[in-house]
Amino acid sequence: MVIQKEKKSCGQVVEEWKEFVWNPRTHQFMGRTGTSWAFILLFYLVFYGFLTAMFTLTMWVMLQTVSEHTPKYQDRLATPGLMIRPKTENLDVIVNVSDTESWDQHVQKLNKFLEPYNDSIQAQKNDVCRPGRYYEQPDNGVLNYPKRACQFNRTQLGNCSGIGDPTHYGYSTGQPCVFIKMNRVINFYAGANQSMNVTCAGKRDEDAENLGNFVMFPANGNIDLMYFPYYGKKFHVNYTQPLVAVKFLNVTPNVEVNVECRINAANIATDDERDKFAGRVAFKLRINKT
């Protein structure tokens, strides 16, 4: 014979919950006395306090082994990569000459990007250095901080400087300037005491034909040794990366051209197929004209 359990009324359930929360007979709150709750809270306070202290101690010990100026491990950044400006999502530089809005965003980005290179700012913050040699600033047992940086003046970019330029870096006339910059790598040396230079070309034969002529600023795409080595963001507070500007003069209109630019230096490998940005950068250039 099945014995049916008597169903509690709503009032009984409420009373049981009220008694669980606070039992006036035993003076228990949610099943525990005040003393029991005090011991529980004290235990967790000590437990989590100990964990926090252990975490803080281990972090402090670890930070004593790390320099705040130079990363401890840099082997993954042995070869600097190249990037272009104006910065676009897919490295596509598309210009519709007759459509101002299509290239005005590029012009605004370049204005902002080149602002730190203004000659007046460079003269105020950085040094005039001797070209053709590394600008080394060793500590010699005493922290040499901050490091000084060499001037890279905007006027060195010639017709791509954008100074008093009614063509807006050439974008309004279909002769755009694209800027090549080398990513910063701490304590990087070009090797063989020879200046580096950037070269650009079409990736395929048809790209080379459609690319046409171009000029580089500084001349021959040179990057002088005096801008190296780089000592890090905290050491080299006012460091400005050297740039190479490429002005494309007569790209075949309405055709997508694949361009690849490489940095040429004694110890930079540009043929690593696993890293498409090691010492090189590829981008697409299209000049639309109606």
Curated annotation (Swiss-Prot):
Cellular component terms per the entry's GO annotation: apical plasma membrane; astrocyte end-foot; cell body membrane; cell projection membrane; cytoplasm; external side of plasma membrane; lateral plasma membrane; neuron to neuron synapse
Any one Pfam family match given in the protein's UniProt record, by short name: Na_K-ATPase
Keyword Cell membrane in annotation: yes
Cystine bridges: 129-150, 160-177, 200-261
Keywords carried by this UniProt record: Cell adhesion, Cell membrane, Disulfide bond, Glycoprotein, Ion transport, Membrane, Potassium, Potassium transport, Signal-anchor, Sodium, Sodium transport, Sodium/potassium transport, Transmembrane, Transmembrane helix, Transport
Extracellular side: 68-290
Main location: membrane
Membrane spanning residue stretches: 40-67
Ranges for region immunoglobulin-like: 193-290
Record-linked InterPro entries: Na/K_ATPase_sub_beta, Na/K_ATPase_sub_beta_sf
Localization: Cell membrane
Superkingdom of the organism of origin: Eukaryota
GO molecular function, one term: ATPase binding
Its job: This is the non-catalytic component of the active enzyme, which catalyzes the hydrolysis of ATP coupled with the exchange of Na(+) and K(+) ions across the plasma membrane. The exact function of the beta-2 subunit is not known. Mediates cell adhesion of neurons and astrocytes, and promotes neurite outgrowth.
Family to which this protein belongs: Belongs to the X(+)/potassium ATPases subunit beta family.
Domain notes: The C-terminal lobe folds into an immunoglobulin-like domain and mediates cell adhesion properties.
Subunit and interaction comment: The sodium/potassium-transporting ATPase is composed of a catalytic alpha subunit, an auxiliary non-catalytic beta subunit and an additional regulatory subunit. Interacts with BSG.
Protein name listed in UniProt: Sodium/potassium-transporting ATPase subunit beta-2
Source species of the chain: Oryctolagus cuniculus (Rabbit)
Gene responsible for this protein: ATP1B2
